[in-house]
């Protein structure tokens, strides 16, 4: 009996489905009645777009999280130049967790000083790095195994991208540095203006401008991502590394392909030099990580930092939003 009842109900639904839908009466002679009839008809099939208290409450409760996150660091004053500009990107270097309250922060200029690269790689940064982090800073003394880390391609595993600097308070021995680790940074000192990202001009490469025209015609996203790349080389038969910043609106996989193309000659030269002494710890060529994003329609501002008779041309991304990612080995 139960089966027969279900069959009868299904047959009834199938028969009703063959019938035409019910008609709707709409007055065509009276304007107010016509508007009311159309409105009633549409209300059966479409939801109202009029905001209600419930919808507003739900929108406020699920608002995107845009509160910036800041981090404070204590570093030895001799390892961090007081002339580093606001917005310079900071990297935290740590080999072991020994419970010390002191940190080690590296900047593009201090990393260039440690890298062992020749001046031709970034001539302006090379000059300023020699002034800010010369022999008197003792920067290399804090990383006694630097050469080994570069030779084995492990330096980036101890280097964590932090974010742009928004404040530095210097004293004789200890310096307090504040960084915007997530979101848009605000200066801690008055006036509390936005702090963007400041990078040396000779260390930044625009991948979208240097890529072939076929790729440049592809649709661009709403944001341009800033990347940092650290590659391991050999200069004058000694281990070295090179820090380079890239910007692109492409996807990550395509960016990695363009970075490999950018370093094609360097990759070939390195593996030719090491062809007789290659082993597994020397196979890593480089790694890349994301630093954050800027709007696609914003353009960096060219500025110049004057340092003891020389100048450092920099690019300032005013609308930079920090969103650091982990290092990814690309070769």
Swiss-Prot record:
InterPro entries: Herpes_1 (IPR004999). It holds the Pfam family Herpes_VP19C. It comes from the Viruses. GO terms for biological process: viral capsid assembly. One of its GO terms (cellular component) is host cell nucleus. Keywords: Capsid protein, Host nucleus, Virion. It is found in: Virion; Host nucleus. GO terms for molecular function: DNA binding. Its main location: virion. Belongs to the herpesviridae TRX1 protein family. This is Triplex capsid protein 1. It comes from Human herpesvirus 8 type P (isolate GK18). The lineage of its organism: Viruses, Duplodnaviria, Heunggongvirae, Peploviricota, Herviviricetes.
